[in-house]
Amino acid sequence: NQHVGNFPGVTVDRKDGVIRNHKEATVTDLPGIYSLSPYSNEEIVTRDFILSEHPSGIINIVDASNIERNLYLTMQLMELDTPMVLALNMMDEVRANGGTIMVNQLEEMLGIPVVPISAAKNEGIDELIEHAIHVARYRELPGRIDFCTAGSDPADPRGAVHRCIHSVGHLIEDHAAAAGLPLRFAATKLVEGDTLIEKALQLNPNETDILGHAIAEMETVTGLD
């Protein structure tokens, strides 16, 4: 069963439904996006929904034939501290083209269930639903990938971004809690220059100055801006 409406303030469809044989589970089909950066209505709608509605779980459906592009969003979603399952869609096409994806290794690396599916052929859907309900019911959170396994040297660019995010996290900890934002997600978005997150955190001028210095130091080490 499905109900179609609109998200407030935008002309983006909102589709809500329940899963057959799992009437207790309501599913909201969010717009397809490639990142949680607020550059389009679809990205804003998706991000705002996850941050404000606090869903019990996320089913992250990616195109298995273009997995590198899609995993960027997956990594961002993992920062939201919400149970998640990764669905590798179009696996039938991957196999037909002679490709393979090492699902077990990907699952181990990400710390979330990874389920190969084909939506067009209705393959793997039951398994996907069972995994999604399980992680939501038992609040099984994604693993955390630490990108600073090396680089204790302050001049080492490999760990500069991580150190900056860690430092910003300490700075905004109370603000993130007050705003109901996952700490690492908020810190990461601040380092990326996300003005909407900065506004939501309501930093004081001194904290804004400290944030600017932390980002400038990171950019000096990495050569990025």
Question: Where would I find each of the regions flagged by the language model?
Answer:
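Conserved C-terminal guanine-recognition region of P-loop GTPase G domains, centered on the G4
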Residues: 17-25, 45-115
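Switch II (G3) loop of P-loop NTPases
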Residues: 2-4, 24-41, 64
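Canonical P-loop GTPase G-domain recognition
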Residues: 92-153
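Switch I (effector-binding) loop of TRAFAC-class P-loop GTPase G-domains
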Residues: 1-22
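Extended helical scaffolds that flank P-loop GTPase cores
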Residues: 111, 138-141, 145-225
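Alpha-helix N-cap/helix-start motif
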Residues: 5, 39, 70, 96-99, ...
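Conserved nucleotide-binding/hydrolysis micro-motifs of P-loop NTPases
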Residues: 9, 32-34, 64-68, 90-95, ...
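Solvent-exposed alpha-helical segments within well-ordered globular domains of core cellular machineries
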Residues: 17, 28, 44-48, 71-79, ...
